[in-house]
Amino acid sequence: MKRVGAHVSASGGVEQAPLNATAIGAKAFALFTKNQRQWKAPKLSKATIEAFQKACADGGFQPQHILPHDSYLINLGSPDPEKLERARSAFIDEMQRVADLGLQLLNFHPGSHLKEISEEASLLLIAESINMALEATNGVTAVIENTAGQGTNLGYRFEQIAFLIDRIEDKSRVGVCLDTCHLFASGYDLSSTEAIETTFNEFDSTVGLHYLRGMHLNDAMQPLGSRVDRHASLGKGTIGMAAFTFIMNHPACEEIPLILETPNPDIWSEEIALLYSLQQVD
């Protein structure tokens, strides 16, 4: 089964997220387990954890269909030793929160070199950061998200993601989330069935489709290779619908969270229904 959902609000407590997902007809969801603009948050209470798990069970959401995202403040490739230490500590805390909720995945943007060190030096710091977090926690997979390559963000080429995975000690606990807008912005064409098939094949040969743990389904505001991270509603941007039809019929996308981060939450239920309508019956 394809598991389509959206990055829903957890305002009022994480237990609200599965309720918000159910309300839009989602079969998966993403959330922040804390305020994504803050470094610290109180530990999740037993009551909150139990309420979250009950809401997930009631909505039919399994842990592998839920894709928590870490704080935007965290830069695991920071050239500043003090900031790097803070980022690593915060990332471990995010992983522990995911584990406390009984979940299995933590989606994150790799990091940025900030023009102060080389791309490779920053990638080595990111790999080291991931290894440290996996060592300090149990049961949670680090899910690397490809980026649009905006500014000095790394992870915009499949080769960079492969570089990171090659250096992860426990490869059973590393995966990838592919964002369609980011792919297109970073130069991977998705604008036709042939184009996205070529991109998927390149990902498979460079990284491996067996590492795919989730996707973010977003159209793009800017043209191919723009390196600008601006999401558009499905069919309203520069990617077009062929890519989403391909994804909704690709076996590698079975039973993983396929998450909308499109700009209009009011039409998420319609976009979810649209995606399911693209499935071809055998």
UniProtKB/Swiss-Prot annotation:
Q: Which residues form a coiled coil?
A: none
Q: Please name the GO terms of the biological process aspect recorded for this protein, alphabetically.
A: base-excision repair
Q: Where does Zn(2+) 3 bind?
A: 182, 229, 231
Give the record's cofactor note, including how many are bound.
Binds 3 Zn(2+) ions.
Q: Does the keyword Hydrolase apply?
A: yes
Q: What SMART domains does this protein map onto?
A: AP2Ec
A GO molecular function held by the record:
DNA-(apurinic or apyrimidinic site) endonuclease activity
HAMAP family assigned: Nfo
Q: Which family does it belong to?
A: Belongs to the AP endonuclease 2 family.
Q: What is this protein called?
A: Probable endonuclease 4
